Amino acid sequence: MIPSAYNNNMQPFQTAAYVVILNEMVHDARIVPLDRRLHLPEDVRQWMGDARGHWDGDTLVVETTSFTDRTPSFNPTITSGVGSGETLTLTERFRRVDADTLFYEYTVDDPATYTRPFTVGIPMRKSELPIFEYACHEGNYGMVGMLAGARAEEKAAAGRQ
């Protein structure tokens, strides 16, 4: 979930056994088990890694390992893609600061790429806006029509209030 250059909105959901983090960027949905199950075997690798979560007081801690060798250890939308995720451990912490702010902190530990782990912290403000569909449109020819339709729906909804 390391932030990228754009589309950084996210929406978390929680059940008794899982946290799901829906990211606006490419509509990635990360399903994080909270039951302290073991990580997948070392030879099973996934593009988004293998996440496990637990609560540490009021902080959700998510540790993700077992990335593929083709997953960059740092987001390629910010850089050209740095390193290989094969030795990456990503540790994330989510803590609610107040009713409208979630503090997101992540630590990148990838000894094959970096000399030492590094940690970044980002306050994330609550938004009432929807998570938009992530879609690439060839030449954006249809964008004018989609936006016109959305504005018409908003206008109609405002008239009903």
Question: Model regions: which residues?
Answer:
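PEST-like low-complexity, intrinsically disordered acidic/proline/serine-rich tracts
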Residues: 1-161
